[in-house]
UniProtKB/Swiss-Prot annotation:
Protein name per Swiss-Prot or TrEMBL: Complement inhibitor RaCI7
Tissue: Expressed in salivary glands.
Function per UniProt: Complement inhibitor. Prevents complement-mediated C5 activation by binding to C5. Binds C5 at a different binding site than the other tick complement inhibitors OmCI and CirpT1, and the drug eculizumab.
Domain of life (superkingdom): Eukaryota
GO cellular component: extracellular region
Cysteine-cysteine disulfides: C37-C61, C42-C63, C57-C78
């Protein structure tokens, strides 16, 4: 019985170590920047109405700022947004529709 308890404890420990390794390796990987957003810095400032606005990222990029929402006059980094492929279909009227 003691051997069975030891085996269960060993399996639980190995499982916990494996899960911990999976989560820690995922957190250490950074987001890859590429294309038009690479090496681009964006800014959050106040406009003439006192509203916080972001600027500086090209079209198709997202400005990510690692500061609280209440902070203004801070810099961020531009990241490429994921694109999606959309398909459109068009139909031509048949001879039956025209009559």
């Amino acid at each position: 019985m003691a051997a069975l308890n030891g085996l269960v404890l060993l399996l639980l420990t190995i499982s916990a170590m494996f899960i911990s390794e999976c989560y820690s390796s995922g957190e250490s990987q950074s987001i890859q920047r590429k294309g038009q957003c690479e090496e681009v810095t964006c800014h959050r400032t106040l406009n003439h109405l006192g509203v916080a606005v972001t600027s500086g990222c090209p079209s198709g990029c997202l400005c990510v700022i690692s500061a609280p929402d209440s902070a203004v006059n801070v810099n961020g980094t531009c990241y490429q947004l994921m694109g999606s492929t959309s398909t459109t279909t068009s139909s031509t009227p048949s001879s039956e529709d025209q009559e």
